[in-house]
């Protein structure tokens, strides 16, 4: 072990947070019912946004749930930069329909909204009560996060960003309990992303990797993830932008953004 490593990390306790299970690969979303049942979920609230509904991705997932005879309720009101009111509305739907688990479908907004529901439904109170670090004290409902963009890494992080409309600020909630139980990164769900969104989300992943790599909280594990993420982004992002139907490039970006998420999630 190098003297540099000893000076940086020896004698320190570091942590590494990731979902219990992660599935990456073409059509892995077909495993959602099995994974949900394994967690004990019988009636999930499906949290998504109008864009995911309009492009047909929600139907792809609900068809899978229907085929497996899984009862569910849909909340499609997630908005960009989800608000406390957004979380309140979704939580009411969750409780009114006696849901017992969560499935989020989309990018960061859908995942953050679902995480907000998990906090309030599982612990009570208001979402504002959980601003800060590890403020919850009860387990989250079983939670499957289905990613549709190769960018934020929200499907696997312990971060939840919710806008407080009264204070007009974004609340940063960092809590290991909101890490999804299962993360799904199915490149087939990303084939329809336009070039502009593919590029923007890819740069988001690159930013996460670079920030993690230069962080003072970086560890050998986060460095390894960040380095591989940057390598894959360099290899696959331009291909995915040029041809959205390039399955190898889409799958490569799934790995890239997940690796970047692992780095960022644990070096912040």
Which stretches of residues belong to each language-model region?
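A glycine/threonine-rich phosphate-anchoring loop and its flanking beta-alpha core
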Residues: 20, 122-220
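Local beta-strand N-terminus motif with an aromatic residue
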Residues: 41-43, 99, 141, 180
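Active-site segments that bind and position negatively charged phosphate/pyrophosphate groups
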Residues: 212-268
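N-terminal small/polar loop signature for handling phosphorylated ligands or for N-terminal nucleophile
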Residues: 53-128, 239-250
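An N-terminal, well-structured beta->alpha segment
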Residues: 1-75
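Conserved beta-strand elements of the Class I
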Residues: 45-46, 101-103, 144
């Amino acid at each position: 072990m190098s003297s540099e490593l000893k000076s940086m990390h020896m004698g320190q306790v570091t942590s590494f947070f990731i979902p219990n299970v992660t599935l990456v690969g073409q059509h892995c979303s077909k495993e959602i019912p099995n994974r949900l049942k394994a967690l004990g979920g019988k009636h999930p609230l499906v949290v998504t946004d109008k864009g995911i509904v309009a492009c047909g991705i929600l139907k792809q997932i609900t068809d899978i749930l229907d085929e497996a005879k899984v009862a569910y309720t849909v909340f499609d009101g997630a908005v960009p930069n989800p608000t406390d009111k957004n979380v309140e509305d979704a939580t009411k739907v969750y409780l009114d329909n006696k849901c017992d688990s969560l499935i989020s479908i989309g990018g960061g907004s859908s995942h953050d909204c679902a995480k907000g529901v998990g906090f309030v439904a599982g612990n009570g109170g208001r979402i504002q009560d959980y601003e800060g670090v590890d403020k919850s004290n009860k387990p989250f409902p079983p939670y499957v996060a289905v990613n549709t963009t190769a960018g934020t890494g929200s499907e696997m992080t312990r971060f939840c960003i919710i806008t407080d409309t009264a204070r007009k600020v974004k609340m940063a909630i960092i809590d290991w309990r909101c890490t999804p139980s299962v993360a799904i990164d199915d490149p087939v769900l990303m084939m329809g992303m336009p070039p502009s969104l593919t590029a923007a989300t890819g740069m988001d992943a690159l930013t996460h990797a670079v920030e993690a790599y230069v962080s003072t909280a970086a560890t050998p594990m986060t460095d390894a993830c960040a380095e591989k993420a940057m390598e894959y982004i360099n290899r696959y992002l331009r291909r995915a932008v040029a041809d959205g139907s390039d399955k190898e490039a889409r799958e490569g970006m799934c790995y890239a953004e997940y690796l970047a998420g692992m780095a960022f999630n644990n070096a912040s």
